[in-house]
Amino acid sequence: MYIFIVNPASRSGHASQIWTEIETLLKERNILYRVYFTSHRGHGTKLAQQLTKDLSSRTTLIVVGGDGTVNEVLNGIEHPEHIILGYIPTGSGNDFAKGMALPSDPQKALELILSPNSYRTVDIGVLKYSEKDTKKIRKFAVSTGIGFDAAICHQALVSRLKVLLNRIHLGKLSYAFISLRELALHKPCRCRISFDNGTEVTFEKLHFAAVMNQPFEGGGFRFCPNAQNNDGKLDLCMIHDVSKIKLLFLMAIGLFGWHTSLKGVDTFRCKQVHIHTSAPMPVHADGESAFLQDAISVTCEQERLLMITPQTIQK
């Protein structure tokens, strides 16, 4: 029995058509399955909680949607030790699929799930912050971040332009347009960053800090090109003390991972990091908003989730 959680609104509704094709294949092969559809933001978390809270044996749970849908399901899984996770990417960015080397073609992704040839136990990141004096925890599979990149994520969630571009399969361009708009509004902050090995750094003007569990975020940006999601560590990229024009340049070459050795860029690898800023800045987890924060903590939970993959990555 396979359990599917489907976000029919993914990529401006294109996922609904993809699910129809997938369901046709399942019925043709007489494969037993159950399907649940998300209907609003956060629904994937509630569905995952309901479906996994009483599990006592291995169950294959398959997500059909974008990175945001994966994040919602991840935050709802009650017993990860009983879950085998499959993923059919239907979003506009699909960074999680890129990092896992999963097929972008939905039918090929389904074939991989139905006839898996390898598995990988992946790390999960955990973001901790406060909201109205309440401590919040949000898990992530791809990345979390604070500052300019998170501001772009916030706007992408509500952007009508992204919806329009998704309909003509140009959704990735929306990030470029949003970046230019947010650049005019962006204000860097002084920050202090502490790592689990005792190292501490301060920057006068932090533009953003990206904490990554795998190489890709934001539709393909490679801010931490050497990040691996099965090494028990997180990779951190900080862009600081540069002009807005150079910030834009560094982000542009960040698509190829060419920025890491340039002035104004620092990278670290760690198991835990604490970030404090002089003023609240936007925060995201897998592109989902965690609003404005001036203090966050991020940790890595090693080998927490079993994934169906096309190949095994050696540590």
Q: Where does each model-flagged region fall?
A:
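ATP/nucleoside-binding phosphotransfer catalytic cores, i.e., glycine-rich phosphate-binding loops
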Residues: A15, F195-N197, F203, R222-K315
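Short Gly/Thr/Asp-enriched flexible loops that form oxyanion-binding sites at enzyme active sites
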Residues: T69-E81
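Glycine-rich phosphate/pyrophosphate-binding beta-alpha loops
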Residues: G145, D149, F208-C224
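ATP/NTP phosphate-donor binding region
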Residues: M1-L61, N71, K108, S118, ...
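Glycine-rich beta-strand-to-loop/alpha-helix junction loops that act as flexible
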Residues: P8, V64-G66, T90
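Catalytic core of DAGKc-family lipid kinases
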Residues: R29, H79-G86, G91-K205
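Short, solvent-exposed amphipathic alpha-helical segments in soluble enzyme
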Residues: W19-I22, T52, E78, L157-L161, ...
